[in-house]
Design a protein with these regions (language model features):
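An N-terminal assembly and electron-transfer interface module characteristic of large anaerobic redox
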Residues: 1-180
Length: 180
């Protein structure tokens, strides 16, 4: 089965007098985080139950700093499913291992809005310049709100995992349908 490691990347900010201290997004305290973890667990179970291929969803790991993220990125999984809530860029970069598959999930309407819904493209993927700069990721690896979109990506990655490194016999030579 395809081993999927879900990760909730977040940061809780402390109140600071006479300044703007709240982060952008909908996760502001431990209660919000607990509710989000529960929401993610339910959504992942529903998605896994609907999958028609072998999938092993590992327990959700919360990460709040780059050191934790780097350790998780090296873990024993095929796909890292990153819930990019409101963590720093350094955390997301540490979670992304170019040698493994990564899918970023962000919320706009399906729960508390995530900061990275607003800035994933310009800050994470493009690094505030015109060219893409995040190794191992592009805009097609970012999913907004839709677990059906995650599931078809996981289905494709499962097929790829089960094909890579295998011998394939093509009778009459390799080919497909159509002209040419």
């Amino acid at each position: 089965p395809l081993r999927v490691q879900p990760v909730l990347a977040y940061h809780l900010y402390s109140k600071r007098e006479m300044t703007s201290w709240r982060p952008w997004g909908g996760l502001h305290n431990e209660n919000d985080i607990a509710e989000e973890k529960e929401r993610i667990a339910k959504e992942l179970k529903k998605m896994a139950d609907s999958a028609e291929f072998g999938i092993d969803i590992l327990p959700l790991i919360p990460v709040t700093n780059a050191e934790q993220a780097a350790k998780v990125a090296k873990g024993n999984h095929d796909v890292l499913l990153m819930y990019a809530a409101n963590s720093g860029l350094d955390v997301l970069e540490a979670l992304t291992n170019p040698d493994k598959w990564t899918i970023m999930f962000v919320r706009m309407k399906s729960g508390p809005v995530y900061l990275w819904y607003e800035i994933a493209h310009n800050r994470y993927l493009r690094k505030t310049v015109d060219e893409y700069g995040q190794p191992g990721m592009d805009y097609q690896d970012v999913v907004v709100d839709d677990y059906g979109e995650i599931l078809w990506r996981l289905r494709a990655l499962n097929g790829l995992k089960n094909t890579l490194g295998k011998r394939i016999v093509a009778l009459g030579g390799p080919g497909g349908w159509g002209h040419g």
